Amino acid sequence: MTYQISATKLQTYHRCPYAYFLRYEHKLTTPEFFGSAALGNALHQALAQCHRDWHYRFPLPTMQWIYQCWQEHSDGLSKSQVVEGTKILEQYYQKFIASEVSIHQPLAVEGKIQGYLQVENLEFVISGRYDRIDFLEDGGLELIDYKSSREVRLPDASEIDIQIGLYYLALEQTYRQSLQYLSLLFLRTGEKIRFKATGEHRKQVQTMIGDLAVRLRHDRGWEPTPGKQCDRCTFARYCPSVTANPAPVPEARSKPQLQLALNFA
């Protein structure tokens, strides 16, 4: 059984190895709160169909094509959500489709991507999701991540760097092409924010996974890293860096998953 790693897991490890250990190795559960994702999911699905199923014999799809895609994926939404989604897609069309001479067929739309990394005799499977992957005219790839949140909230720079590095590794292995940009496209505001990707992002992630592998291999070194993240950490009650008399850590639910492999590749 290989060891699964994702941007979310590696970002947790980067913030605090102890929090990573409690959540992913010790399997402590955390309370999670989710708002209604129905509108966001419907928008993602409509845009996926728009870019995946357009026949590309003509330079640009029409607005009618956008309406058709939206109609097929807006069942179950409230009337106000349908109206709101229509306005969001009309704005998207005007800004990212109608303003172009032509659009090109994406390399991939709405899927999963995997990569592999071997270090410290452990095999890591890198996994992630994407909304769209485009070929760039000057070479390389752009990964586009749709955001349907009401506010434009950018992750910390370090978290973006980790996400870029993991996608860089996975895309390079899958398509033999380098990631040039990770783009966050905020659907409600029509803003598209691009982050340049380089080989340094890949190296940073390789080093971080190597450090994680050493801790996993020897099952030690999970010291807390105090910081601003402590205020919202759900494991604060168990942490000696935050709580004077921390609660005992509950018994582990399952053993860590480790897989022997070859040397770092």
Residue ranges and their predicted role:
Residues M1-T2, Y18-T30, Y67-H73, L143, ...:
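Short amphipathic alpha-helical segments and their helix-coil junctions
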Residues G111-I209:
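Mg2+/Mn2+-dependent nuclease catalytic core
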Residues Q45-Y116:
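A non-catalytic, helix-rich entry segment at domain boundaries
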Residues Q4-I5, D138, A170-A265:
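Metal-dependent nuclease catalytic regions and adjoining charged, substrate-binding loops involved
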Residues Y13-Y20, A42, W54-W70, Q177-F186:
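Short, compositionally biased low-complexity segments
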Residues M1-K9:
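Short acidic, Pro/Gly- and aromatic-enriched capping/linker segments at domain boundaries
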Residues C16, L43-H44, R132, Y167, ...:
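A residue-level signal for conserved active-site and pocket-lining positions in enzyme catalytic cores
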Residues L10-Q11, R15-H55, G85-T86, E90, ...:
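Nuclease catalytic cores
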